[in-house]
Curated annotation (Swiss-Prot):
Record's miscellaneous remark: In plastids the F-type ATPase is also known as CF(1)CF(0).
Function: F(1)F(0) ATP synthase produces ATP from ADP in the presence of a proton or sodium gradient. F-type ATPases consist of two structural domains, F(1) containing the extramembraneous catalytic core and F(0) containing the membrane proton channel, linked together by a central stalk and a peripheral stalk. During catalysis, ATP synthesis in the catalytic domain of F(1) is coupled via a rotary mechanism of the central stalk subunits to proton translocation.
Transmembrane annotation, as ranges: 36-56
InterPro entries xrefs: ATP_synth_b/b'su_bac/chlpt (IPR002146)
Annotated keywords: ATP synthesis, CF(0), Chloroplast, Hydrogen ion transport, Ion transport, Membrane, Plastid, Thylakoid, Transmembrane, Transmembrane helix, Transport
UniProt source species: Gracilaria tenuistipitata var. liui (Red alga)
A Pfam family this chain is assigned to: ATP-synt_B
An annotated Gene Ontology molecular function: proton-transporting ATP synthase activity, rotational mechanism
Family in the record: Belongs to the ATPase B chain family.
Name recorded for this polypeptide: ATP synthase subunit b, chloroplastic
One CC-aspect GO term: chloroplast thylakoid membrane
Assembly with partners or alone: F-type ATPases have 2 components, F(1) - the catalytic core - and F(0) - the membrane proton channel. F(1) has five subunits: alpha(3), beta(3), gamma(1), delta(1), epsilon(1). F(0) has four main subunits: a(1), b(1), b'(1) and c(10-14). The alpha and beta chains form an alternating ring which encloses part of the gamma chain. F(1) is attached to F(0) by a central stalk formed by the gamma and epsilon chains, while a peripheral stalk is formed by the delta, b and b' chains.
Length: 182
């Protein structure tokens, strides 16, 4: 930066008394135009090769990165598609399991209700049988008591009505009947 300032200060302080002016030199050989052109062409050729190879390498890297990205995108889309298929299958399996569970629960509930009804019917039958047995036993007890009371009553009436004469006749009658068997 300082050198640019020095150049400008030299040009500004240049003595104009010498009648020097800036002009275009038409002599190509003295002006080194050919050398400058050759230098520029050489630089362009070298830089073209250098920059061209760098740009080609860069372009190849970018294209390779794009291809890799596209390949990863294809793989990701493939995995996504496969995952969506698996999700759909899983949802179908879950729906089927839920349906089977509901069916099984309904069957179990119905089985429990049927078993409960059968148990109630058994209890009713057992209760009826128990009641019938109790009725028979009570009837037998009543009959025994009625019979016992009747025998006591008849015995009491007989004791009141049978005289010793009647008693002797009954005994003789029974002996006579037994005598025929002996």
């Amino acid at each position: 930066m300082d050198s640019c300032i020095q150049v400008f200060s030299v040009i500004a302080n240049f003595d104009t008394d010498y009648n020097l002016s800036i002009s275009f030199n038409t002599d190509f050989l003295e002006a080194n135009v050919i050398n400058i052109l050759l230098l520029l062409l050489g630089l362009m050729y070298v830089l073209k090769e250098f920059l061209g190879s760098i740009l080609v390498d860069r372009q190849e890297k970018v294209l390779l990165a794009i291809q890799e990205s596209e390949e990863r995108l294809k793989q990701a889309n493939s995995r996504l598609s496969e995952s969506e298929k698996q999700l759909a299958q899983t949802q179908m399996v879950i729906a089927q399991i839920i349906k089977e569970a509901e069916t099984t629960a309904q069957k179990v509930r119905q089985s429990i209700l049927d078993q409960g009804k059968a148990d109630v019917d058994k209890l009713i039958s057992a209760s009826k049988a128990s009641i019938a047995t109790a009725e028979v036993q009570i009837k037998q007890q009543i009959q025994l008591q009625v019979t016992s009371l009747a025998i006591k009553r008849v015995t009491m009436q007989l004791q009141d009505q049978i005289t010793p004469n009647i008693q002797t006749r009954i005994i003789d009658n029974n002996i006579a009947q037994l005598g025929g068997y002996l």
